[in-house]
Amino acid sequence: MSKNIENHDSVLLLQDCIAGCKMALESMDDIREHTDDKQLRELIDKYYDEHTRLSVDCRDMLDKAGADIKEPGVFAKMAAKLQTAMKMAVNDDQSQAAKLLTEGCNMGIETISGSLNEYRDADSKSVAIAERLRTCLFYTSPSPRDTR
């Protein structure tokens, strides 16, 4: 283990963070395709950039530790893509896009919160990145009322 990552829990937490960032980025790409609302598009772009920065930070720490990068599960990626396509095909409005973003953020917050609880021995740098991701997810989630 590198001195940059103190223990195995830190690696596991960062791997969950990077997988979550990748899921979020793919979901935002999928939703952006169905979005013509300028305000919602700007929100997606802002948090897309933040998730990208978080992903790079995780990757850098994992690379320094010589740890593998975790990919989101194939089933989870396909299910998210299919859900977005189906829901937007039925109701292709900005409120639906905002709801999908909110649902994704809620799942991400749950997942990262669970990882923080599970990997209690993670070092402070890894925990700080996970907390940044959780905060980013919280603020990414738009209110459907804001897009009407």
Model region roles, listed by residue range:
Residues 41-49, 76, 99-102, 127-132:
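Short, charged, amphipathic alpha-helical segments
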Residues 39-75:
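Conserved alpha-helical segments that form or flank metal/cofactor-binding pockets of metalloenzymes
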Residues 37-38, 123:
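Short loop-to-helix capping motifs
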Residues 114-132:
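Acidic interhelical loop/turn segments
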Residues 139-148:
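Single conserved hydrophobic/aromatic residue that forms the stacking wall/gate
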Residues 60-109:
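Carboxylate-rich helix-loop segments that flank metal/cofactor sites and access channels
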